[in-house]
Amino acid sequence: MATGVTVLPEHFQNEGVDAVVERLAAARVDMIATSPYVMEPSTDPKASREPPIDAGAGSVRLLDRPLWGKRELLVSTAPSFTPHLPFYRGLRYRPATPTALTQREGNVIPRFLRAAQSRHIQTWLQVQAAIPPGYRVQFGGPQDDDKPRLPDGSIPKRRLANNGSLASPHILDYTLALTRDLLRAYPDIDGIRFDWPEYPPYFLDDVFLDFNPHCAAAARRLGFDFPRMQQAVLALYRLLHGGLTNRHLERQLATDSGRQPLLTTLLDH
């Protein structure tokens, strides 16, 4: 069985390309994935915290491995390459603009890839499946009409993941253009790994996505009865958001095993 590890750029920016790759090789890693961005410390109050706050839950976390000598800090990022803009012509979403950080640090990505390849480690690039511009999970995101929807058609008020609808043609077109661009910029990689090609269930509402009109159109093409699905899921959503009563609890307590009554409740809602 192959062993794969994701190593984000900030770590080998700090600890050195050769040092990181040597440790991976010593651990007999078969493949690595990294992402096409670079990072630096920032003093801008609007910069991102590392580690991420993650909707407040991560605000007490500290880094296990320090970055730039700190276990928590503000950072800014930039793409590690200069995008080929003709690939994105006419698209809703655009790649991030290179900065001075790109020019100064961008070469660390191909250096890391070459160092891994020289040790017979497969190299992959990891990008976000539905968070344009896709380089890093903590920035970017979709426009409102490309966001996942609840069965009542609304956008959840509280989400951690900023993923767009996986059926959005705008996001699909951008992802195709980004894929072409990455293969142009890094032609020697073994593959591309699309991170978060799902709706991560951090909150209860996340379980009830996606009823975006883009998904309705996809369901029709695939022969699914989307209105029936939407009505059934909406009924369950309402049951779990204010519709539960003592009667449901009594059914739970009526048997030694709570699983079967719960399943019956969910199926008979």
Task: Tell where the protein language model's regions lie, with residue ranges.
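Catalytic domains of carbohydrate-active enzymes, especially glycoside hydrolases
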Residues: 18-42, 63-80, 185-191
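N-terminal structural segment of carbohydrate-active enzymes
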Residues: 1-57
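Structured segments of extracytoplasmic/periplasmic soluble domains
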Residues: 23, 27, 35, 115, ...
